[in-house]
Amino acid sequence: MNKTSLPPIDSIDRQWYVVDAENQTLGRLATEVAAVLRGKTNPSFTPHLDTGDFVVVVNAEKIKVSGRKPQQKLYRRHSGRPGGMKVETFEALQERIPERIVEKAIKGMLPHNALGRQMFRKLKVYKGTEHPHAAQKPQPLQLNPSASAQ
C-alpha cells in the first residue's frame, strides 16, 4: 500500500490576496474567500492541515445582500451576563462595524474547531480601500466575474 505524501507545514508557501467587496453579494464572496483561507485552491490541500493563504478584504462597508435582508437579517451576540442578549439588524451593524458582517459570514464557513480558528486568523477585513498589508504585495483575487459586469 502506498503512503500519501503530506507537505511539511513549514514548506507551505502562503500567498496574500486582496479582495474588493464593493457590490459583491455577501454569501458568494464569503464562500470563495473561505475556500482560499482553507487551502482548497492549493494542489497540496490536506483537510487536517492549515494550507490556506492570507486574504485581505477591502470596502467591507459596500457589501450587498438581496431582498429585505438589510432590514430583516439579525445579528445576535451575548455578553454572558443575565439579560445580556443584543440584537442588531444588518443595516445597523453595517453602519456601525461593517467588518464584523464579512468576518462573521466567512467564519461560519470555516471548520468549527482549533484549525478553523487558525484559518480565521489569516483573514483581514477593512473598511475603505486602504489596508496596512501593502508590504506583503497581495495579488487581486477575482471573485464572481459576472457580478462585476452588472
Swiss-Prot record:
Protein's GO biological process: negative regulation of translation; translation
Listed Gene3D superfamilies: Ribosomal protein L13
UniProtKB keywords: Ribonucleoprotein, Ribosomal protein
Compositional bias annotation for Polar residues: 139-150
One Pfam family cited in the UniProt record for this chain: Ribosomal_L13
Any one annotated GO CC term: cytosolic large ribosomal subunit
Region (Disordered): 129-150
General function of this protein: This protein is one of the early assembly proteins of the 50S ribosomal subunit, although it is not seen to bind rRNA by itself. It is important during the early stages of 50S assembly.
PANTHER family in the cross-refs: LARGE RIBOSOMAL SUBUNIT PROTEIN UL13M, RIBOSOMAL PROTEIN L13
Quaternary structure (record): Part of the 50S ribosomal subunit.
Family (UniProt): Belongs to the universal ribosomal protein uL13 family.
Protein name: Large ribosomal subunit protein uL13
Species for this entry: Synechococcus sp. (strain CC9605)
Gene field: rplM
